[in-house]
């Protein structure tokens, strides 16, 4: 009993430590000032979410028509409603400005939490390496508009952050959770991923499908998970697909240089990673430390970056996934007892 109590207290202390670090960096004291957040594209989301809360939700709508700009425009037909829904519920307790800022901050906290969860050896034991990896990931500053890190929230990429976090949690519950309903829970997170942003959903769907098909699970649980996913995403996805012809082409010029994929703050990590792979290759092969998931993130990002057709996906958006794969791989190699995502 003493050993269990000691481990529990240690686990709680570690969680509190990383939570305090996040709070200090995220300036929660400013979050609770009742003002209107601005900065970059984030400020442009305020009108949309305000309209969503005042006009759509009271009428049980997730999209509709807004008269806030020129002759009006369709709102949330082509963008992702879940962050606005989260803000709506926060706004039941807090003023709009505070609710909006809490929603943005929660996206960063969830990204760190999801990375930490994926790095756990067991479902209930916090991973120090995972929490450190999560903090490092969100504090990278070599890109500011692609999503996933703290700097990108000012570009309105909190939606991407939510989607990435939910994608990670869907993989965690699919592979590592001991919950009897891990398949339905995983499908809820996958649906939340899609309802937050499309790009992480596209990147994670192939590896999720592979794990989903390869896992031995009660057939009814799998049917239930599919039903839950479709029930959650069908309404918004149907309106998106039916009106897809009206979407605009952003006409981004794709990157072609390797330095646009490998940013300066991740480059030292890659050198360290290469050194560790060379030094520990025998142990890595023996212990089977390397897993499909992080290798998939790295190599799919590289392949899509150089070979994705122009216009299908702006290849700059692959940088967050490449960085995440590198950070995952480095963290796993540092762990003396291998942490397997497929355990």
What residue ranges belong to the model's regions?
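Membrane-embedded transmembrane-helix bundle of lipid-linked glycan/lipid transferases
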Residues: 2-336, 340
């Amino acid at each position: 009993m003493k050993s269990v109590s000691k481990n529990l207290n240690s686990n709680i202390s570690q969680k509190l430590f990383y939570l305090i670090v996040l709070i200090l960096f995220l300036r929660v004291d400013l979050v609770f000032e009742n003002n209107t957040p601005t900065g970059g594209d984030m400020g442009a989301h305020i009108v949309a979410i305000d309209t969503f809360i005042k006009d759509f939700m009271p009428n049980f709508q997730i999209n509709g028509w807004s008269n806030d700009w020129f002759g009006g425009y369709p709102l949330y037909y082509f963008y992702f409603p879940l962050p606005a829904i989260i803000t709506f519920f926060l706004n039941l307790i807090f003023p709009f400005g505070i609710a909006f800022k809490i929603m943005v901050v929660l996206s960063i906290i969830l990204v760190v939490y999801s990375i930490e969860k994926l790095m756990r050896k067991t479902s209930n034991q916090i991973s120090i390496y995972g929490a450190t990896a999560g903090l490092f990931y969100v504090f990278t500053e070599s890109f500011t508009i692609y999503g996933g890190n703290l700097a990108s929230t000012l570009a309105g990429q909190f939606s991407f952050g939510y989607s990435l976090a939910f994608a990670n949690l869907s993989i965690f519950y699919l592979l590592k959770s001991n919950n009897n309903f891990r398949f339905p829970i995983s499908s809820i997170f996958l649906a939340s991923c899609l309802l937050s942003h499309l790009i992480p959903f596209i990147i994670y769907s192939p590896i999720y499908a592979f794990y989903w098909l390869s896992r031995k699970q009660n057939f009814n649980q799998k049917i239930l998970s599919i039903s839950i996913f479709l029930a959650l995403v069908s309404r918004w996805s149907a309106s998106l697909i039916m009106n897809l012809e009206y979407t605009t082409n952003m006409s981004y010029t794709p990157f072609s240089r390797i330095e646009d994929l490998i940013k300066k703050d991740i480059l030292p990590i890659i050198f360290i990673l290469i050194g560790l792979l060379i030094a520990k290759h025998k142990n890595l092969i023996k212990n089977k430390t390397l897993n499909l998931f992080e290798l998939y993130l790295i190599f799919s990002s590289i392949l899509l970056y150089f070979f994705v057709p122009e216009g299908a996906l702006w290849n700059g958006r692959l940088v967050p996934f490449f960085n995440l794969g590198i950070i995952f791989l480095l963290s796993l190699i540092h762990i003396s007892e291998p942490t397997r995502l497929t355990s």
